[in-house]
């Protein structure tokens, strides 16, 4: 079985993420997609919404979009490094302990993300030991060239801060979780 690992904050999940999952599953690039939400991105100073709430938003958005449980999973790996950070390298290594040895993992990342991975904690080792599939982002070319998604989680958060409704860029269920918990209003 080949599992695609979709890295990101998913703060919040949006239609771009859902389109990526649909594309890689429909094209047979992977058999299942595993969301690996960042516990806390060391590059971002803004504190993310709790990882549990983000997992609820992911689960809700995926079900609302017609995906079944056997097509995706959400893994919250909070393996903290000795310096107190949660690095992608450590999270990915933890997955090897959780899943069967015969699973083939593929990192699904935006072209900009994959390009910057070498700068990450143990990034060269990560790129050497993990296969990647690049997904196009505006201004970049990639293996999946027709996936240029112009929506971003930060744009959605900005809409919410300005009391705008971010539909149709998020699912209705995601919107309800955001409203119920008064998220992104700061």
Please provide the spans of the model-predicted regions:
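Nucleotidyltransferase catalytic core that binds NTPs
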Residues: 1-186
């Amino acid at each position: 079985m080949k599992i695609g690992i979709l890295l990101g904050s998913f703060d919040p999940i949006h239609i771009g993420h859902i389109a990526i999952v649909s594309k890689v599953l429909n094209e047979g690039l992977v058999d299942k997609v595993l969301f690996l939400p960042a516990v806390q991105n060391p590059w971002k100073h803004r504190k993310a919404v709790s990882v549990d709430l983000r997992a609820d938003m992911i689960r809700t958005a995926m079900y609302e979009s017609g995906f079944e449980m056997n097509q995706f999973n959400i893994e919250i790996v909070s393996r903290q490094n000795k310096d107190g950070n949660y690095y992608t390298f450590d999270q990915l290594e933890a997955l090897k302990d959780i899943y069967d040895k015969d699973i083939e993992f593929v990192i699904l990342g935006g072209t900009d993300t994959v390009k910057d991975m070498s700068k990450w904690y143990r990034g060269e080792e990560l790129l050497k030991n993990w296969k990647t599939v690049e997904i196009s982002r505006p201004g970049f070319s990639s293996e999946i060239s027709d996936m240029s998604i112009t929506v971003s989680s930060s744009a959605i958060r900005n809409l919410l801060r300005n009391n705008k409704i971010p539909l149709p860029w998020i699912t209705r269920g995601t919107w309800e979780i955001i409203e119920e918990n008064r998220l992104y209003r700061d």
